[in-house]
Amino acid sequence: MNADRSSSFATPTRRPVGGPAPWSRCALPLTLALSALLAGCGGGSGGEPNEPTPPQPPTNGTPGGSIGESQRISAARSTATNNAACTAIAPFYWEVGDRNAARVSGSVNRAGNSTVYTADSFMPLASATKWLFGAYVAELRAGVLTPQDVRHLTFRSGYTSFSFCLPGQTVDGCLAVPASNGAFTTSTDGRFFYDGGHMQKLGSLVGLGNLNNGALATEMRRLLGDDVAISFSQPQLAGGAQATPADYARFLRKLLGGQLRLGALLGTQAVCTNPDTCANALATPVPRTESWSYSLGHWVETDPAVGDGAFSSAGAFGFYPWIDATRSWYGVVARDAAAGSGNESANCGRLIRKAWVTGVSP
């Protein structure tokens, strides 16, 4: 895995969570109805990114347009239970909602498999942790990020040799052992390189270095809210959190509702990530047939052919949270599967999102 971080999201082992490329390869062939938002590449060598203009959130009323809720529910439910991309990943739990509450949800089961996932199923988040940490830093800075924060949260800091954390370590302990975790690489500084080292180093820089799993979870909840009941299996800021879909959905609703400052910053400071189309990109887990952007601890699905501008942060074991480009809706696809399952969850989740937004099952 360490030999080729740019070509696959897969992690070689079930535990520890994370590592340098913590979710599965994301070949997403779906053409979505919404127009692609935000530009792809930008910026010269070593400079700040060209910042795409994020979509504006709705200013009043309840989102929905002319499509009736019953039509949306029917389309989303049909997609989750019948579309081949979704039945292939069963069992899983899914949910779509707005800033106030869930609007539709369900458990899709598999014959012969006794596992049933619900909103209260506790599971590893893997790279979905990144979105939480981005929101934590935004709260810590009262919404005004420093240039150093931005470089670390958009994976351009030069800390690009992360391997794993051990459960009993602190944040700083993980930076020290294995030694590669805290290594700075001059040749990657200022260029996009998908790796957990950026966030681990930033965690130390913002004062989290002495915290172990329990203390880290307490501190994150202090700013994100105790109702976002995350815990940590290892003190890794890019991939060590655990939670239920219900907990993560509360986090997404807070982003939509403006209770967390990152909600207003979604998609900002985004950088190009495809080395084939962007001179400032070195390593990405997204297939090079697609060009996504990376914002402050979350992806922006901006590929001009198949992207819809949604914000997301898929995890290695199949947890896929998203917010749509208009910042009207959120969703989750949640399961605890083998390492490398983020791709399949994203494929299903994008279809459910399209069904909800358009009212038509793909």
Model-derived features with residue positions:
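N-terminal secretory signal peptides that target proteins for export/translocation
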Residues: 1-23
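N-terminal low-complexity, Pro/Thr/Ser-rich intrinsically disordered segments
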Residues: 49-85
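Structured C-terminal helix/loop/strand segments within mature extracytoplasmic catalytic/sensor domains
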Residues: 61-74, 307-362
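Bacterial signal peptide processing site
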Residues: 42-45
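Active-site-proximal loop and beta-strand segments within enzyme catalytic domains
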Residues: 86-90, 99, 105-106, 111-195, ...
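Penicillin-binding protein/beta-lactamase superfamily catalytic region
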Residues: 192, 207-311, 316
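C-terminal motif of bacterial Sec signal peptides marking the signal peptidase cleavage site
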Residues: 37-40
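A short, well-structured edge-of-sheet supersecondary motif
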Residues: 72-119, 320-324, 328-335
